[in-house]
């Protein structure tokens, strides 16, 4: 597949991947600092607690990474002609029935798994997805605490790399029978409908993991086989699923 088929004109795949690595590991450093109550890098302020008039570590971390990603992408590629949409800016940008004015769209989730971030489980992630025509073509899923950066280009390749750039391939499990398949499910968003469905499927077992990014990573490592989320208020949104979908495809 040619580069022009998956990226905007004038955007080099290698240049883009280099910038995405820089932004991703920078985001990891920011989130890890906030998670530990330390001074974050890149000029961001240490979080004040809600009791002390601040927004708390979760909101501060979310907003800091949001700013880091938006400024990084717009600054590195000022002429790319894409639109940047994040979970934090969606309410301002999205008007019902009105399409966003660009063929290419970045969908960003600066902190996937806020509850796990707050609880200190380490199961949180950062998502970046480049979308064209309502379909993700490039996805990045960063797991800061695991030092894993999952990258996928639809129709090209998908892999995991660490901070040193060492790559590992996607390893889907070889389990085939329904009774052998392992489910990855939410630790905090479970209801009677999901429990009933899991019981009816009679799978081989299940694993509770926080954040969509961390759940999908267990599938990419071959630790689990499927993820089920039912419709409802807590169901994953576009910024939760776009990047993982690109890596899985």
Residue ranges and their predicted role:
Residues 1-111, 196-199:
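N-terminal subdomain of lithium-sensitive/metallo-dependent phosphomonoesterases centered on the IMPase/IPPase/PAP
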Residues 68, 125, 243-247:
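Short amphipathic alpha-helical face segments that pack within enzyme cores
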Residues 99-163:
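DPxDG-like acidic metal-binding loop motif
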